[in-house]
A protein has these predicted regions:
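Aromatic- and charge-enriched surface segment that lines or borders ligand/interaction sites
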Residues: 38-48, 149-194, 217, 310-315, ...
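N-terminal lobe/hinge region of extracytoplasmic solute-binding protein
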Residues: 86-87, 99-155, 186, 260-262
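Extracellular/periplasmic solute-recognition and catalytic clefts
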Residues: 208, 268-281, 302-366, 386, ...
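Ligand-site clamp/hinge motif
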Residues: 253-254, 282, 286-332, 472-473, ...
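Surface-exposed binding/hinge segments that line
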Residues: 94, 163, 198-246
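Gly/Pro-rich hinge or "lid" segments in bacterial periplasmic/extracellular proteins
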Residues: 120, 124, 134-142, 234-294, ...
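Detector for C-terminal structural segments
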Residues: 15-18, 58-85, 284, 347-348, ...
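Ligand/substrate-recognition segments at binding pockets and active sites
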Residues: 28, 35, 42, 103, ...
Length: 619
C-alpha cells in the first residue's frame, strides 16, 4: 500500500514538474517571439534612420533640407502619381526594405551602354538606372510625370514643353537639369555616335531647347501622334558624364558598360562593367531623388545560358524567378517542391511582342531570292504556325498576323492568317522560277541552283531550336532545303548590324500603339538600322508617313490598318506567334499584380518587396 502510494506521489510530482517546465518553455517562446518583433522593429527603424541620413546627405549636397519626417514612408496623397503604387506598397503592414532581387539571363550581354545596346536584356537593366520625363500608368495607360511635373503642347501641336521637378539629381550627386535633356538629344544626333536606332526614333524632332534650369522644349517638324513617347520617353543622360565621348566617339560606340543615370539603382562603377563578369549587379542609389525609396538593396542578373542549370539554380533558391519553356512548365506545375516555395504566373501580356522569320532581300549589292514577294509568301504558306503552337509551344501562344496585336485598334479585322498550304506555295514558287526538274524532290531555279538557305537562330533557346528543326523537315517536304544555323547572341547582333544572313528568326517587343517605321520604312535599311532585311516598298513608306503625321486617332488607325494589309500581302516577315509568359516566382516576393502593362515585377518605381522575416541577403 505504502509502495503504491509512493509511486502515485512520484507521478504527481513529475506531472507538476512537467507542467512547470511547459509553462517555462511557453514563456521562453513568448520572450523569443517578443525579441523577434523587437528586432524586426529595430531593423525597420534602422532602415528609416538610414533613409533619413541618406536624404539629409542628398539635401545638404543640393542645398535643400528634407525636414524631420524624411525617414517615414510617404502617404499616397503626398507623392506624384508615378510613385503612388510604390507608396501604397510601402504602406502595407509587412513592407520592408532590404534583400536582393536575383534573376537570370539566358544569354550573355555584349553591352549595357545606353543607346548602343539593342536588345531587351540591356533595356531591362537600364530601366532601373536611366529615367525619362514621363511614363505610362500601368492600369489606365495615361501619361504620368516622372522627372517632369507638368507638360503642355502649343496650339500648333509641334512644340511640347516640359517643366522638371525641383531637386532632381544623378546618382553621383550632380543636379539633373533641362540642359541634360537637351544634351541627350544633341548627343544622340551626332553622326559619329553610332546609335542609328535612337536617331530613327527621334527623327521627327527638329530641336530640343533648355529654356531655363527646369524647362525644356521639344520642337517637332510637324504634329506627331507619338510625340509624348518620343520626347517624354527619352532616357536622360548626364551631360557632365557623357560629353567627353563627343571627343572620343569610338570609345562610346565600342564600350561595354558606360551607364550612369538618375534612377533608383546604379552601377558601383559606372564605366567598369564588362561581359566577362558573368553577372550584372546594381546597388541602391543612396542619392535617389524620388519620394519612395526603392525596396531592394541590390538587383542582380546572373548569366546562366543552360536551361537545366538555370532551373537547378532556382531550385537551390539562388535566383528568384524562373522563366519556363512550355514543356518544362507543363511538367513543373505539378512539382510539389516548387509549388511549396514558388507561385506560377501564366499570362499573355496586353503588350506582348511577337516572333517572326525575317527574309533578307539583299546581301551586299545583290538581291536575294527573298526579294521576290512571291517567294516570301510561299515560305509563309509552307510554315505551319498552328502546328508549331500546338506541338512546340503546347498551346501557350497565339498566332501573330502582323506587328499589331489582334486586340489593338491598329489591327485590320478583315485579315486572316496566312494558311498552311503546300499546293499554293508551290504555285507561287513556280511563278518565281523554282520547280522540281531532276525528280529528286528538290526545287531549283532556271540555272539549276537548288532552293537552299540558312536560318539563323539563337543557339541557347530550346524552343527556337525545336521550331527550326520542325521547319527544316516541313520545308524539305516541299523541296526547299533550310539549314538551321545556331548562333551566339553577340554574333547574331553583329549579323543584323552587317545585314549578313539569309533568314533569321527573332522577336520584337510591343507597346500600346506600335510605330513600325523603324522596322519597315525604306529609310531604315542603313547599317545598324532595324530594317535589316532591306525591305523597300514606296506604298508602305507613304502609308507609314501618313500615319505618323496624323494626330486624329480614328484617321491614324485607318492608315495603320492599310499598312497592315500591305505587310500581309508582301510578307517581309513570316509572322509566327505571341507567346504567353510562363514563370515561377519565389513566394517571398510580395505585391505581384497583373496590370494593363503586364506583371508588375519589373516596374519602376518598384512595387514589389520581401517582408523582413523572409529576407535572405544583407546589403
Amino acid at each position: 500500500m505504502n509502495r503504491h502510494f509512493g509511486w502515485i506521489a512520484t507521478l504527481i510530482v513529475l506531472g507538476i514538474l512537467l507542467l512547470l517546465v511547459m509553462v517555462q518553455i511557453d514563456r521562453q517562446w513568448q520572450r523569443m517571439a517578443s525579441m523577434q518583433n523587437v528586432m524586426t522593429e529595430q531593423a525597420r527603424d534602422l532602415r528609416a534612420l538610414r533613409r533619413s541620413l541618406q536624404g539629409l546627405e542628398s539635401d545638404l549636397a543640393s542645398g535643400r533640407f528634407a525636414g524631420m519626417d524624411a525617414g517615414r514612408a510617404p502617404r499616397v496623397d503626398e507623392v506624384p502619381s508615378a510613385f503612388r503604387r510604390a507608396a501604397e506598397a510601402a504602406g502595407t503592414e509587412d513592407y520592408a526594405e532590404g534583400d536582393w532581387l536575383v534573376q537570370a539571363f539566358g544569354t550573355g550581354l555584349a553591352t549595357i551602354t545606353p543607346y548602343v545596346s539593342s536588345d531587351a536584356y540591356a533595356s531591362e537593366v537600364q530601366n532601373y538606372v536611366l529615367e525619362s520625363l514621363v511614363q505610362r500608368d500601368p492600369q489606365s495607360l495615361e501619361w504620368q510625370g516622372l522627372l517632369a511635373e507638368s507638360w503642355e503642347f502649343d496650339d500648333s501641336g509641334t512644340e511640347l514643353t516640359f517643366r522638371l521637378r525641383p531637386g532632381l539629381q544623378f546618382s553621383d550627386g550632380e543636379p539633373l537639369t533641362a540642359e541634360d535633356v537637351q544634351f541627350t538629344f544633341d548627343f544622340l544626333m551626332v553622326d559619329a555616335i553610332a546609335v542609328p536606332r535612337a536617331r530613327a526614333f527621334l527623327e521627327k524632332v527638329e530641336v530640343v531647347e533648355a529654356l531655363d534650369e527646369r524647362t525644356v522644349r521639344f520642337i517637332f517638324e510637324e504634329p506627331y501622334f507619338d510625340a509624348m513617347r518620343v520626347a517624354g520617353g527619352l532616357g536622360v543622360l548626364p551631360k557632365h558624364f557623357y560629353e567627353r565621348y563627343l571627343d572620343e566617339p569610338e570609345n562610346f560606340n565600342e564600350s561595354r558598360g558606360i551607364l550612369l543615370g538618375s534612377g533608383p539603382y546604379r552601377l558601383e562603377d559606372p564605366t567598369g562593367w564588362t561581359p566577362d563578369a558573368g553577372r550584372i549587379e546594381l546597388e541602391r542609389n543612396p542619392r535617389y531623388w524620388g519620394p519612395v525609396e526603392p525596396s531592394f538593396d541590390r538587383l542582380v542578373w546572373r548569366v546562366i545560358q543552360n536551361d537545366s542549370a538555370r532551373l537547378t539554380t532556382f531550385r537551390n533558391r539562388d535566383i528568384d524567378v524562373y522563366g519556363a519553356r512550355p514543356r518544362e512548365y507543363a511538367r513543373l506545375r505539378d512539382d510539389e517542391a516548387l509549388r511549396e516555395r514558388a507561385d506560377t504566373h501564366e499570362y499573355m501580356s496586353p503588350t506582348a511582342g511577337y516572333s517572326y522569320i525575317a527574309w533578307n532581300q539583299r546581301r551586299g549589292s545583290e538581291p536575294t531570292r527573298f526579294a521576290d514577294p512571291r517567294v516570301r509568301k510561299a515560305m509563309s504558306h509552307l510554315t505551319d504556325v498552328d502546328r508549331l503552337i500546338e506541338e512546340v509551344m503546347l498551346g501557350y501562344a497565339e498566332r501573330a498576323i502582323s506587328p499589331f496585336s489582334p486586340r489593338s485598334d491598329q489591327h485590320n479585322p478583315d485579315l486572316e492568317p496566312i494558311p498552311y498550304n503546300v499546293e499554293r506555295a508551290l504555285e507561287l514558287l513556280a511563278e518565281a522560277g523554282y520547280e522540281e526538274k531532276n525528280r529528286d524532290g528538290v526545287l531549283v531555279n532556271e540555272e539549276g541552283e537548288p532552293f537552299s538557305f540558312e536560318l539563323v537562330y539563337f543557339q541557347d533557346n530550346e524552343d527556337t531550336r525545336r521550331i527550326a528543326l520542325f521547319l527544316r523537315d516541313l520545308y524539305a517536304r516541299a523541296g526547299v532545303e533550310m539549314k538551321p544555323t545556331p548562333t551566339e547572341w553577340s554574333v547574331m547582333l553583329e549579323n543584323l548590324s552587317r545585314q549578313d544572313f539569309d533568314a533569321i528568326t527573332l522577336g520584337w517587343t510591343s507597346g500600346v500603339e506600335v510605330d513600325i517605321y523603324q522596322m519597315f520604312h525604306s529609310s531604315q535599311t542603313v547599317s545598324g538600322g532595324d530594317n535589316f532585311i532591306h525591305y523597300e516598298n514606296p506604298e508602305i513608306d507613304a502609308v507609314i508617313e501618313a500615319a505618323r503625321g496624323e494626330v486624329d486617332e480614328a484617321e491614324r488607325m485607318e492608315h495603320w490598318r492599310e499598312a497592315e494589309r500591305i505587310l500581309h500581302e508582301d510578307q517581309p516577315y513570316t509572322f509566327l506567334m505571341r507567346r504567353q509568359t510562363l514563370a515561377f516566382i519565389d513566394r517571398r516576393i510580395q505585391n505581384l499584380e497583373q496590370t494593363a502593362l503586364g506583371l508588375n515585377l519589373g516596374f519602376v518605381p518598384l512595387e514589389v518587396y520581401v517582408p523582413f522575416e523572409q529576407q535572405r541577403h544583407g546589403q
